[in-house]
A protein has these predicted regions:
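Nucleic-acid processing machinery
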Residues: 1-2, 9-268
Length: 268
């Protein structure tokens, strides 16, 4: 039901252009502040990204257009980097005998702008615009985790890994079920590129959220899902009967929403 609500909100955001400017701004802010974090909590990353981008487009139209234009202007160079970077990885994956596909992921417009603001840097100094995603079929279900690390070891022989930027979401899944191994490798041109290693199952969970998570897991209900229900009830209470300090309370709710997703990764 909640995932259907996220899809409805996503569809509604696409029709904002027909509304009055003040209505656009209100809905965009509401979407960015509540619905995008909720989509993230449900593991609906595609919808989360689109909600963020659509909200940003209506709240900051000039900045949105500027970043969109710069992404378009640099697309050819990114495609070239992607092909050159992944060619030896494909050869190595072929040697391993795994069924796989390799995709390019470009940082979203909202994420780029957000990083520009927090890091106080221009677009030209955002160096993680491109990420590479390796999606594979494990040899068998029991080897899924081992296959992730085997791929990591294999591609680390091709490119130098960044020792401080290994994120093991395989052994330590996020609260919304997300699993992947994130590594950062230095390409031949000296550029650091993030590589996300996922099985097809992990990718389904990343794309479809809890719907896919429970499809692969027998039974139902979990502590995390219970926490999500509590968060949703609290949000509903605030929206139904707003208090003078409702905005401050929403800040607290957003913090609590992600509290169970804090991990510390340290190099061995």
């Amino acid at each position: 039901r909640r995932q259907r609500q996220m899809c409805i909100r996503d569809s509604n955001m696409r029709t904002l252009g027909s509304m009055l400017p003040n209505k656009q701004f209100k809905i965009a802010g509401e979407t960015l502040y509540i619905y995008a974090p909720l989509a993230n909590r449900l593991g609906l990353y595609k919808i989360k990204t689109e909600l963020e981008n659509l909200s940003f487009r209506y709240e900051h139209p000039e900045e949105y257009q500027e970043i969109e234009n710069k992404l378009a202007a640099t697309a050819t160079e990114r495609d070239k980097v992607f092909k050159e970077f992944t060619a030896p990885i494909r050869a190595q994956m072929d040697k391993m005998g795994l069924k796989y596909r390799i995709l390019a992921r470009v940082k979203s417009i909202y994420s780029i702008w957000n990083k520009m603001q927090t890091k106080h840097v221009p677009f030209e100094e955002i160096y993680d615009l491109l990420a590479v995603r390796i999606i594979f079929e494990p040899r068998n279900a029991d080897e899924e985790l081992n296959d992730c690390f085997d791929i990591y070891v294999s591609i680390s022989k091709i490119y130098k890994p960044h020792p401080d930027r290994l994120r093991d979401w395989v052994s330590h899944p996020k609260a919304n079920g997300y699993q992947a191994l994130h590594v950062t490798l230095m390409g031949n041109n000296g550029q650091w590129i993030e590589v996300q290693i996922r099985s097809e199952r992990m990718n389904d969970v990343a794309e479809q959220g809890f719907a896919a998570h429970w499809k692969y897991k027998e039974g139902g209900g979990s502590e995390d899902e219970g926490e999500l229900d509590k968060w949703l009830r609290t949000i509903k209470e605030i929206l139904d009967d707003p208090q003078p300090d409702a905005i401050d309370f929403l800040d607290t709710i957003k913090l609590n929403l992600f509290a169970s997703e804090i991990f510390v990764f340290t190099p061995k």
